[in-house]
Amino acid sequence: MNATAWQDCTFTSADGLRLYYRDYPCAVPGRLPVLCLPGLTRNCRDFESTALRLQRSRRELSPDLRGRGGSQHDPDFRNYHPGTYVADLALLLRHAGVERVVLIGTSLGGILSMLIAATSPQVAAGAILNDVGPEVAQAGLQRISSYVGRHTPVASWEEAAAQMRSMYGVAMPDATAADWMA
């Protein structure tokens, strides 16, 4: 265990990739663990503060999906797909010795949570969804595809704030210039 109270763990996917997750153990036995699933371009670190709070009363697992964070890159772009991610997560749970979880998912992680609940209801005790719902509008998908993987280097904080505003401003129309710089 490291100084921040989690264990760095890896498991092997069905197609041989080394995939990473953080395991935040809990001293209280018998409570349902939580599986926290990040958004499209995010990783397990998004849930660190949540996990540290949850750890007082339950175990928490946070993966880096394939090709992100500490997980190995998949050379086959067709495997960056929700069905593949769900299969990877089933192997993660088996590796961690977990049969049933409460899911917390942000954006893509919320979609994966819904897929797990629909395809493996015996695994999903409940779900908390953030930044996603049962329907995803085509306009939202087009907006996301317009900026994912297209970040350009910036020379100043002002340029960085402008880039963030161009990508996320539609979701936060009331944010001021000072908010984007914060």
Write out the residue ranges for each language-model feature:
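Conserved HGGG/HGGXW glycine-rich cap/lid loop of the alpha/beta-hydrolase fold
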Residues: 17-75
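Conserved alpha/beta-hydrolase catalytic His-Asp/Glu region
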Residues: 155-182
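Active-site acidic short loop of glycosyltransferases
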Residues: 16, 30, 56, 97-100, ...
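A catalytic-pocket lid/entrance helix-loop region that shapes and gates access to the active site
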Residues: 124, 130-159
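Conserved hydrolase catalytic core segment
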Residues: 99-138
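Short, well-ordered alpha-helices that flank and scaffold nucleotide-derived cofactor binding pockets
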Residues: 49-52, 56, 91-94, 118-122, ...
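N-terminal cap/lid segment of alpha/beta-hydrolase-fold proteins
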Residues: 1-19
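Active-site loop/oxyanion-hole signature of alpha/beta-hydrolase fold enzymes
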Residues: 49-52, 62-104
